[in-house]
Amino acid sequence: MLDRNKLRNNLDFFKKKLVERGVSESQFEAYVQADKAMRKLLHQIELANQKQTLLAQQVAKKKGDPKLLKESKELKQKLEQLNIAFKEAETLSQELLLNLPNIADESVPVGRDETANLELLKEGRKPVFDFTPLPHWELCERLQLVAFDKATKLTGARFVAYTDKAAKLLRAIASLMIDLNKNKYQEWNVPVIVNETSLTGTGQLPKFKDDVFKLENTRYYLSPTLEVQLANLHANEIFTEGELPKYYTATGVNFRQEAGSAGKQTKGTIRLHQFQKVELVKFCKPSEAIHELEEMTRDAEQILLELKIPFRRLLLCSGDMGFSAQKTYDLEVWMAGCNEYREVSSCSSCGDFQARRAMIRYKDLTTGKNTYVATLNGTALAIDRIFAAILEHYQTKAGEVMIPQALLKYLDFDKITKPK
């Protein structure tokens, strides 16, 4: 959530920065007017309270004065009406504020969509095959790794059921990701069901209510990302400065409606309603956030280096970043069978945007004041997508898939062949 006071005192600056994030001028103006209306009512309440205090003193001096008693009664009724109006105005103002995204860091390029993203680096060589490589969904069918039909029977479209070696490979991928960061990040195992407050804290609600699965007749939701659980572990808490920075990680399942994915590639294991990933979350002082983002992104990249899969790093433009992000790097792997790059990680600094919503603070030793922390989150990595990338990158002319060296210690096989 943006700082109300900074917004009020820098309207032109915030209008420019928010328009760069895709906010319409009318949406911004609606918030400004709602905030003004709320403050006007608050001022009227303050004046009425002052008048009520004076009236009380006068009534005490002139006991039983009918005129003063009537005036006091009318003022009391007016105050009640003003307080009701203020609560309504405050609710509207808060709702509109919660729907405004974070503003971009000055280092972020301005742009509408992914075409304005900047490619910063490439690692690894794209494989050269002496045959036509297959996309992962065809390999899944030929090697009987994913029972797409059974998953559809169990649930519906865009769910998958991994079989035997595929299930073991998925578990191995998750283990490698956790193990590579276990000395730096504290591991958690958290619920997959979260409440409205947690989703509001990290920014999924209220704006993206159509993208999350809500449990019927409850205020609970299936979590769309482990960022929600890990970031909200310290909601309404105050760190000592010495406790920062804190690094957390978790692996688990996530659920998304993917309401805006019409027309996008939905074959295979890339874009699912239920998916698995390893998440990294950091809490630090705001002045250290950008440095911590660089470190987090390198932590995610290290996994790809271990797996020896070619990838690139992108700096996302203002219009392509997530709602809560201040600055974001995406990591995309080369999908040899699809002949394209696909995202497997998104690492973001959110500044104090989420901390302000979730009330996560630290005691600043210099000022003695409670100050909002900065939060960061990153996928390290998307497990189903890495599974797909391994199939495409390590496929052979014989129709087999070799297991990357980094995963062999977790498995009792070194290649996947078609079952007899």
Swiss-Prot record:
Keyword field: Aminoacyl-tRNA synthetase, ATP-binding, Cytoplasm, Ligase, Nucleotide-binding, Protein biosynthesis
UniProt signal peptide: none
MF terms in GO: ATP binding; serine-tRNA ligase activity
Residue sites binding ATP per the record: 256-258, 343-346
Location (main, coarse): cytoplasm
Gene Ontology CC terms, in alphabetical order: cytoplasm
Catalytic activity entry: tRNA(Ser) + L-serine + ATP = L-seryl-tRNA(Ser) + AMP + diphosphate + H(+); tRNA(Sec) + L-serine + ATP = L-seryl-tRNA(Sec) + AMP + diphosphate + H(+)
InterPro entries recorded: aa-tRNA-synt_IIb, aa-tRNA-synth_II, aa-tRNA-synth_II/BPL/LPL, Ser-tRNA-ligase_type_1, Ser-tRNA-synth_1_N, SerRS_1_N_sf, SerRS_core, tRNA-bd_arm
Domain of life: Bacteria
Gene3D superfamilies noted in UniProt: Bira Bifunctional Protein, Domain 2 (3.30.930.10), Serine-tRNA synthetase, tRNA binding domain (1.10.287.40)
Binding site for L-serine: 225-227, 279, 379
UniProt pathway annotation: Aminoacyl-tRNA biosynthesis; selenocysteinyl-tRNA(Sec) biosynthesis; L-seryl-tRNA(Sec) from L-serine and tRNA(Sec): step 1/1
E.C. designation(s): 6.1.1.11
This protein's record includes keyword rRNA-binding: no
Compartments in which it is found: Cytoplasm
Similarity section: Belongs to the class-II aminoacyl-tRNA synthetase family. Type-1 seryl-tRNA synthetase subfamily.
Entry note about domains: Consists of two distinct domains, a catalytic core and a N-terminal extension that is involved in tRNA binding.
Function: Catalyzes the attachment of serine to tRNA(Ser). Is also able to aminoacylate tRNA(Sec) with serine, to form the misacylated tRNA L-seryl-tRNA(Sec), which will be further converted into selenocysteinyl-tRNA(Sec).
Protein name: Serine--tRNA ligase
Organism the protein comes from: Mycoplasma pneumoniae (strain ATCC 29342 / M129 / Subtype 1)
Source organism phylogeny: Bacteria, Bacillati, Mycoplasmatota, Mycoplasmoidales, Mycoplasmoidaceae
